[in-house]
Design a protein with these regions (language model features):
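Short, surface-exposed loop/turn segments at secondary-structure boundaries that line and modulate
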Residues: 55-64, 220-223, 261
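Feature representing long, continuous alpha-helical segments
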Residues: 238, 242, 252, 261-269
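A short beta-alpha structural unit
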Residues: 51-54, 216-219, 255-264, 305
Length: 360
C-alpha cells in the first residue's frame, strides 16, 4: 500500500502574488514563495537544509535547485529538481521531502513550484487539437455540463480572476475546441507556492499546527495521448483506489477536495474516476451543489487553476494546508479535517491522488 510516513508533517504554506509579475525571474519568484512559507511557520530561511523545486518551463535552467539555493543563501544537505507534471510534481516533491527527512538527509525541507509563465519568454510549443483529442460530442453528451464557473476566487484576495461571471458571460466567450470555451480553460500565470516540512516531533516542540499526508498514489499510463486507446480508462481511477485504500477511507470521508482543473472537463473526469459520483453523473453532482461551499464536499475553494492561478497545481496543496489548519479565511470549509488532492500531468499522462489530514 502506498502509505506515507506520519512522522513527517507539513508546517508551512506560502504563496506569492499571482497574475502578472513583470520583471521577476523564476528564481526570484521561487525564492519569494519559500520566504512566504518560512514566515508562515515562523522559520528562519537559513534553517532549511533540504530544497526540492521545479525547473521552470518558461526559461529552462540546468541545476536549478542549486541556483535557487545559492540565491537564498542556503547550504542544503539535500537537493532535487522535480518535473512529473501538474500537481503530481508537487506530490512527488512532498514524497521526496518525507523520505529525505525520515532518512536523516535533512531536517527541514522546502518544496517550491513557481515561474514567470505569463510574462517570461516560454519556448515555442505545439498546440493540442482538443476537439480531436476529446472526441467532440461524445464528451459533451454524457456529462451534460456546458461550463463550470466558480465564484470562489471572489473570496480569495490572491486570485487572478476577481470579477463575477454570469452564465451569459460564459456563453459569450469564444469557442476554443468544442465543447470547451475560453472560460473552460485555466489561467496562464506568474507566481509560486511553497511548503515547509519537518518531523512531527520538531513541529510539536515548536508548537506548530501541522498537516500530515495520510497516503499518496500515482499511475502513468502514457506520454502521448495518442497512445491511450480509451480516454475513459486513465490512471486517475487506479491512483484513487490505491490512495483511498492506503488511507482507509473513501471519497465520502473527505470534507474538501482540491482537484486538478486545467480544464473544466478535467474536473468532470476526476470526480467520476475517484468515485465522488457515478459514471456520467458529474454534471448532475455539480448542479446539485454538492461541490459548492456548504455542499457535501466543497471543490477548489481557492478558485483553482481556472480562477485563482495556474501554478502547476501547487496552490491546490497550499490551499489544502490552509483548509486543514483552519486558516483559509472567508473561504474556510467549516470543520475540514481531511482533504483529497488530485493531479494530472500532460493529458492525464500521469495521475496522482493524495489524502491529507489535520494533525491532532
Amino acid at each position: 500500500m502506498p502509505k506515507v510516513s506520519q512522522e513527517v508533517v507539513i508546517v508551512g504554506a506560502g504563496e506569492t502574488r499571482v497574475g502578472k509579475l513583470p520583471g521577476m525571474e523564476s528564481v526570484q519568484i521561487q525564492a519569494w514563495a519559500v520566504q512566504e512559507a518560512a514566515a508562515d511557520c515562523g522559520l528562519r530561511v537559513p534553517e532549511i537544509d533540504g530544497l526540492i523545486n521545479l525547473d521552470p518551463y518558461a526559461i529552462p535552467n540546468s541545476m536549478f535547485s542549486s541556483t535557487l539555493s545559492e540565491y537564498l543563501g542556503l547550504k542544503p544537505r539535500f537537493l532535487s529538481t522535480v518535473d512529473v507534471g501538474g500537481t503530481v510534481t508537487a506530490m512527488t516533491m512532498l514524497q521526496q521531502a518525507v523520505w529525505a527527512i525520515e532518512s536523516g538527509h535533512c531536517e527541514v525541507a522546502a518544496c517550491v513550484y513557481g515561474e514567470n509563465t505569463l510574462t517570461g519568454r516560454p519556448p515555442g510549443a505545439q498546440g493540442l487539437a482538443l476537439r480531436n483529442l476529446l472526441g467532440g460530442e461524445e464528451w459533451e453528451e454524457p456529462f451534460g455540463l456546458h461550463g463550470m464557473v466558480t465564484p470562489y476566487a471572489l473570496l480569495n484576495d490572491n486570485a487572478q480572476m476577481r470579477k463575477p461571471m454570469s452564465m451569459e458571460d460564459y456563453l459569450a466567450s469564444r469557442m476554443i475546441a468544442t465543447p470547451l470555451r475560453l472560460f473552460d480553460c485555466s489561467q496562464v500565470s506568474d507566481g509560486g507556492g511553497a511548503l515547509i516540512l519537518m518531523s512531527r516531533e520538531r513541529a510539536r516542540a515548536r508548537g506548530l499546527k501541522a498537516v500530515s499526508i495520510r497516503s499518496m498514489a500515482m499511475q502513468s499510463t502514457h506520454n502521448s495521448v495518442a497512445q491511450t486507446p480509451d480516454l475513459q480508462e486513465l490512471g486517475m481511477a487506479a491512483a484513487g483506489r490505491d490512495a483511498f485504500a492506503a488511507a482507509g477511507i473513501g471519497p465520502d470521508d473527505a470534507q474538501v477536495a482540491l482537484l486538478h482543473d486545467a480544464f473544466t472537463i478535467s474536473v468532470l473526469i476526476t470526480l467520476e474516476a475517484l468515485g465522488f459520483t457515478g459514471p456520467g453523473q458529474a454534471g448532475h453532482y455539480l448542479r446539485a451543489g454538492h461541490a459548492s461551499l456548504g455542499g457535501r464536499c466543497p471543490l477548489n475553494p481557492h478558485g483553482g487553476l481556472l480562477s485563482q492561478a495556474h501554478i502547476g497545481g501547487m496552490l491546490h496543496v497550499t490551499e489544502a494546508v490552509h483548509q486543514l489548519r483552519g486558516t483559509a479565511g472567508r473561504r474556510q470549509v467549516p470543520g475540514a479535517r481531511r482533504a483529497v488532492v488530485s493531479g494530472n500531468g500532460g493529458v492525464f499522462s500521469v495521475c496522482g491522488v493524495m489524502v491529507m489530514e489535520a494533525c491532532t
